[in-house]
């Protein structure tokens, strides 16, 4: 009998088609819906309830069972606590990376294995190969939608227990499959933003958990230009929401965030999208989580992304120094952001990644 696969059903079109593709390939397919966040229940509109209803409708259409599980505690402890602590330090975290590492490819994987699954599957745009107990990660066919950036921190052992059914298809193909099948999710919009914030304004949401500390906005020359609402609300390269237009003796060029001084609680800004302070020659990152056997080949010349959907950038990774790596780029990089992740590639293979600790101007 063919292997049993439990698909993480999000209530979206990608996981819906992933489940159908696996069924077509002859696997024993079951669905599982994860609830990772409790606090949307008091809203008039509850996205989790709608997503569950859509996941159930798709499973009914495909005639597969749907399990449900609540990982809210695990999510709070392993993802959200980290998210808050990073913002309190004035950094800009990426909770999606942690959610994949800790919840989808850890808590969900273990739960599925306990339910008798041989593999899990998700609707991620990615590909993998499996050699024994190790999985290797590769970019999806649809480079616009490729999600390996968010998957770089998953353990290789977890990747060996994972199937990515939609990795060889483009998003338009996936939508067309869903439409032809008459799946209720075929026209559902892609989810964007941070999953647990939903429709709330980001500032309003953060204020519920962290006390904001307003401070001064200064030019790179040290001139006070205004007040910020709290460093946690701003990210490097940000242009909108600074509230400092129309200053005397300044041009009409827009202002951008170029630095955050945590010690003095100062936000530094500069004018012009090409201002030198927006650019970095390199960065210092933490320990690299390797998905391929390259750690003994340092220094290494390869490619990297410092944010999702960025074009791959040529770089060189240094050997570790006190668990930190220097990464230097072939050309200056704009708005590298501490707290975010740098992810390394060699052609189509994702080699792994690390947290960005500092920028090197």
Swiss-Prot record:
GO terms for molecular function: ATP binding; tRNA binding; tRNA-uridine 2-sulfurtransferase activity. Residues 94-96 are annotated as: Interaction with target base in tRNA. The active site is at residues 99, 195. Pfam families: tRNA_Me_trans (PF03054), tRNA_Me_trans_C (PF20258), tRNA_Me_trans_M (PF20259). CDD domains: MnmA_TRMU-like (cd01998). It is found in: Cytoplasm. GO terms for cellular component: cytoplasm. Signal peptide: none annotated. Residues 145-147, 307-308 are annotated as: Interaction with tRNA. The keyword tRNA-binding applies. It catalyses: S-sulfanyl-L-cysteinyl-[protein] + uridine(34) in tRNA + AH2 + ATP = 2-thiouridine(34) in tRNA + L-cysteinyl-[protein] + A + AMP + diphosphate + H(+). Keywords: ATP-binding, Cytoplasm, Disulfide bond, Nucleotide-binding, RNA-binding, Transferase, tRNA processing, tRNA-binding. SUPFAM superfamilies: Adenine nucleotide alpha hydrolases-like (SSF52402). One of its GO terms (biological process) is tRNA wobble position uridine thiolation. ATP binds at residues 8-15, 34, 123. The record marks 124, 340 as: Interaction with tRNA. Its EC number is 2.8.1.13. Disulfide bonds join 99-195. HAMAP family: tRNA_thiouridyl_MnmA. Catalyzes the 2-thiolation of uridine at the wobble position (U34) of tRNA, leading to the formation of s(2)U34. Belongs to the MnmA/TRMU family. This is tRNA-specific 2-thiouridylase MnmA. It comes from Legionella pneumophila (strain Corby). The lineage of its organism: Bacteria, Pseudomonadati, Pseudomonadota, Gammaproteobacteria, Legionellales. The gene is mnmA.
